[in-house]
From Swiss-Prot:
Matches recorded under InterPro entries: Dihydropteroate_synth-like_sf, Enolase-like_C_sf, IspG_bac, IspG_bac-typ, NO2/SO3_Rdtase_4Fe4S_sf
Record's keyword annotation contains Oxidoreductase: yes
Cofactor(s) of this protein: [4Fe-4S] cluster
Role description: Converts 2C-methyl-D-erythritol 2,4-cyclodiphosphate (ME-2,4cPP) into 1-hydroxy-2-methyl-2-(E)-butenyl 4-diphosphate.
Cofactor details (free text): Binds 1 [4Fe-4S] cluster.
Family of this protein: Belongs to the IspG family.
Name by which UniProt lists this protein: 4-hydroxy-3-methylbut-2-en-1-yl diphosphate synthase (flavodoxin)
Annotated binding of [4Fe-4S] cluster, by residue: 270, 273, 305, 312
GO molecular function: 4 iron, 4 sulfur cluster binding; 4-hydroxy-3-methylbut-2-en-1-yl diphosphate synthase activity (ferredoxin); 4-hydroxy-3-methylbut-2-enyl-diphosphate synthase activity (flavodoxin); iron ion binding
HAMAP family for the chain: IspG (MF_00159)
Species of provenance: Yersinia pestis (strain Pestoides F)
Pathway field: Isoprenoid biosynthesis; isopentenyl diphosphate biosynthesis via DXP pathway; isopentenyl diphosphate from 1-deoxy-D-xylulose 5-phosphate: step 5/6
EC numbers: 1.17.7.3
Length: 375
């Protein structure tokens, strides 16, 4: 029920990864990456499907060998979400997966080889109508750039990116997006800021190698939050040393927090104190798990007492305000006569939320999972 985001998006060109539009005002796409052995087709497909269930828009798959490229052919046949091939060192792998229907090629300028190899990749991408991501990483810059700057700096990442943007420009190839990732928040943020002033191509955001689930989520929220709040970014990936499913959840949580792209429930819950009249923490944890399948955007406030509860409920789709034995229930900001038994609240709230989601879905107020222009 809150107003939409006040953020003005940076203007960019449009590319498509499969049917997913990227840039030029398209919704910011959430990406993740498999961490299985790509040659283990069953495990990789299972992980891709798990990512699809939590709403991923695009999945990147590492293709380190020709054997992995052959496995990718089978993986692609069993996947519906667009797949990006992550290519390092051997440009010929990019040519092979293009034959097998890959939706985007990610190349690392720091190790893909000389310009003649890039020309071959670009020619192949043009033939198959596949976009490319120029993926700059602070940990794998070209040797001459490392020697020039001594260490990764925003200027170093920018120079690497612009060197390869210029190559694609000379080849008259404009179907590409760019990333300038680093594990340091300020290095990444300042690199993206510089790049955003130089080009109008879509930008893929990420704090690379951010860390474990907790620390990596915090780093990513700070770094990507800064950039997104400035209107910078067209796709994102949260890089965690954790289950890739968590990357997708955190990515949507960041977009949801900035009101850039709503998907699923935005829980508003108090941290609790001695005033709470019911188990707020247990209620929120249970509902987050039970309602993971819902993608209907709505704000749900769960507040343990009457200090802030009524005020939050007024701007929530569904709200509950703690009171002794039975708590107040709000829908669309209006207090209802019905009250919730504090001991049975979880089941009651779940039922109310699901019923409300069905109504909103029927009214076409749902944000679709896949960002397909044809939908």
């Amino acid at each position: 029920m809150h107003n939409g985001s006040p953020i003005i998006r940076r203007k960019s060109t449009r590319v498509y990864v499969g049917k997913v539009p990227i840039g030029d005002g398209a919704p910011i796409a959430v990406q993740s990456m498999t961490n299985t052995k790509t040659t283990d087709v069953d495990a990789t497909v299972a992980q891709i499907k798990a990512l699809e269930r939590v709403g991923v828009d695009i999945v990147r798959v590492s293709i380190p060998t020709m054997d992995a490229a052959e496995a990718f052919k089978l993986i692609k046949q069993q996947s519906t979400v667009p797949l990006v091939a992550d290519i390092h060192f051997d440009y010929r792998i990019a040519l092979k997966v293009a034959e097998y229907g890959v939706d985007c090629l990610r190349i690392n300028p720091g190790n893909i080889g000389n310009e003649s190899r890039i020309r071959e990749v670009v020619a192949c991408a043009r033939d198959y109508n596949i976009p490319i991501r120029i993926g700059i990483n602070g940990g794998s810059l070209e040797k001459d750039i490392q020697e020039k700057y001594g260490e990764p700096t925003p200027e170093a990442l920018l120079e690497s990116a612009m060197r390869h943007v210029d190559i694609l420009d000379r080849l008259n190839f404009d179907q590409f997006k760019v990333s300038v990732k680093a594990s340091d928040v300020f290095l990444a943020v300042n690199s993206y800021r510089l790049l955003a002033k130089q080009i109008n191509n879509p930008l893929h955001l990420g704090i690379t190698e951010a860390g474990g689930a907790r620390s990596g989520s915090v780093k990513s929220a700070i770094g990507l939050g800064l950039l997104l709040s400035e209107g910078i970014g067209d796709t994102l990936r949260i890089s965690l040393a954790a289950d890739p499913v968590e990357e997708v959840k955190v990515g949507f949580d960041i977009l949801k927090s900035l009101r850039i792209r709503a998907r699923g429930i935005n829980f508003i819950a108090c941290p609790t104190c001695s005033r709470q009249e019911f188990d707020v923490i247990g209620t929120v944890n249970a509902l987050e798990q039970r309602l993971e399948d819902l993608i209907t955007p709505m704000d749900v406030s769960i507040i343990g007492c009457v200090v802030n509860g009524p005020g939050e409920a007024l701007v929530s789709t569904i709200g509950v305000t703690g009171a002794r034995n039975h708590s107040g229930f709000y829908e669309d900001g209006v207090r209802q006569k019905e009250r919730f038994d504090n001991k049975a609240m979880i089941d009651q709230l779940e039922a109310k939320i699901r019923a409300k989601a069905s109504i909103l879905d029927a009214n076409n107020r749902i944000v679709i999972n896949q960002l397909d222009d044809n939908k």
